[in-house]
């Protein structure tokens, strides 16, 4: 996984979104803005990207995206239920056509037997009401996990929502 691949995906997503007149948004936790950075590294990205959110804390997920406090308490931030609510929340907050959300444990600390370091949950939502969630287990150091998560996010958004 490389930054070059992330850049290539951003270019491809930008072209596809521009052709459709669509907007994409993102709500990031463990990637800390890496997805938004990759998108905005592309010249002209203001034609398909208006805003993204870095919601690192549970309070930010709740306050900015409307993730239920009970969902956060019951399932934890790194869960299918939370990324589902994050994706819908950011889609609504940004008024976008496609939304990506990500929450995971990049390491080196913070993992558990149930959710080891490298566990990342993803949420994707479209203005058509469709929501998709996915879980991945990545290996490597913190930077590698974050990069793999950003690439997976863009690959999946492109394949399942933008080109579909």
Swiss-Prot record:
GO annotation, biological process: pyridine nucleotide biosynthetic process
Domain of life (superkingdom): Bacteria
Alphabetized SUPFAM superfamilies for the sequence: CinA-like
EC number: 3.5.1.42
GO MF annotation terms: nicotinamide-nucleotide amidase activity
UniProt similarity note: Belongs to the CinA family. PncC subfamily.
Assembly with partners or alone: Homodimer.
Descriptive protein name: Nicotinamide-nucleotide amidohydrolase PncC
Organism: Enterobacter agglomerans (Erwinia herbicola)
Taxonomic placement: Bacteria, Pseudomonadati, Pseudomonadota, Gammaproteobacteria, Enterobacterales
